[in-house]
Swiss-Prot record:
PROSITE patterns: RIBOSOMAL_S11 (PS00054)
GO biological process entries: translation
Signal peptide: none
Subunit structure, interactors included: Part of the 30S ribosomal subunit. Interacts with proteins S7 and S18. Binds to IF-3.
Organism from which the protein derives: Alkaliphilus oremlandii (strain OhILAs) (Clostridium oremlandii (strain OhILAs))
Keywords associated with the record: Ribonucleoprotein, Ribosomal protein, RNA-binding, rRNA-binding
One Pfam family recorded for the sequence: Ribosomal_S11
Protein name: Small ribosomal subunit protein uS11
Length: 133
């Protein structure tokens, strides 16, 4: 006689609401995409959004508007955890740097500090060759 296997029920763990007032906003803006991560002061992520995640595809991912929408989405999610003030760390040469910072301020977060943390090589890797269009 065959035994009937028990159904396994998986419980989805609800994200607990953290009460964090101060945090950091890490904006990584490349030539292809913009990634915004909001963290607490130790660097533990509260929320994250990117232009590609929001449905922007191809060359539209690298626009300032896409970075603005990504920053807005990440800010709203982080503000649910009680985030009020942020220190902004910007990395990369992309078009969405300033747009993302302005969007964080417009969403209601107070920006205390803006710091450029773009890594600069001391003559490391050879850069890509010039594009010929």
């Amino acid at each position: 006689m065959a035994k009937v296997a028990k159904k396994r029920t998986t419980r989805t763990r609800r994200r607990e609401r953290k009460n964090i007032e101060r945090g950091q906003a890490h904006i990584q803006s490349t030539f292809n995409n913009s990634i915004i991560t909001l963290t607490d002061m130790q660097g533990n992520a509260l929320s994250q959004a990117s232009a590609g995640q929001l449905g922007f595809k191809g060359s539209r991912k690298s626009t300032p508007y896409a970075a603005q929408m990504a920053a807005e989405t990440a800010a709203k999610a982080a503000m649910e955890h009680g985030l009020k003030t942020v220190e902004v760390y910007v990395k990369g040469p992309g078009a969405g740097r300033e747009a993302a910072i302005r969007s964080l301020q417009a969403a209601g977060l107070e920006v205390n500090l803006i710091k450029d943390v773009t890594p600069i090589p001391h003559n490391g890797c050879r850069p890509p060759k010039r594009r010929r269009v």
